[in-house]
């Protein structure tokens, strides 16, 4: 059996830098490695409707936005198969059959589902489709016989549930489905990029994103407004690097060439961190450096998207 990748995104808005470091960079690397026989990248419009059923136009419009973001980041249609979920109706049929193999209590225990229900303030008014979307994801993965699924850290519970469905199905109907392996981002700083407000996760619904298509001035405004160490009130105060969103972003995006170009007084990023920790380095200077880094990373993506 060949090596097959299945991955994708919900078209509920433009993609942001959390998607970029969390999955898109990894997809491009895997695509260009030549190690896989097939790569399928799904624009999950049917899944997007599970919490946007009253806003179908939003989903419809963002299908193209997501496709443009893919191409701008380096997804190559000659190497990767980009498709729209709703155009493969068999996925919905397979989801229905899998629903008979999963209990309500098991879905309720899924940490990702619980977190997203809380984030959307659904409480008791959870749409059934949204509640069951881990089952839909399992159908997507197994329908294409995916052997590998690149995911962010927050999606690990979904993949575990998929594996449970595979085991259950195979125990009842015989060895039919393929259990997928998981690939996490190789850069550990990218496992979960926080929002610019310091919240645990960057999210379109929370409005705390830097989008891949943001203009230069929008990026600057967002970076300069970023949450940082609340106890670092004066330049001379020692600052906290661990858990500080500005430094998390630098860990995810900064390259040595950016330090050499934008901060020639420092040998490397670690030296900048040590200066911040002992005091004498203001947040504004660090944010200006981060802005330069983000501009250098995102300008080529933005220009490719426009072309």
Question: What is the meaning of each model-derived region?
Answer:
Residues 21, 57-60, 152, 156-160, ...:
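Short, conserved loop/turn and helix-capping segments at secondary-structure boundaries
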Residues 70, 98, 154, 199, ...:
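Divalent metal-coordination and catalytic microenvironments
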Residues 2-139, 296-306:
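N-terminal Rossmann-like or analogous alpha/beta NTP/dinucleotide-binding catalytic cores
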Residues 37-40, 45, 142, 148-149, ...:
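Glycine-rich phosphate/pyrophosphate-binding loops
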Residues 111-115, 119-173, 194:
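Internal, conserved structured core segments that host functional sites
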Residues 157, 163-307:
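Conserved nucleotide- and phosphate/pyrophosphate-binding catalytic cores
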Residues 23-30, 162-165, 249:
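Buried hydrophobic packing segments
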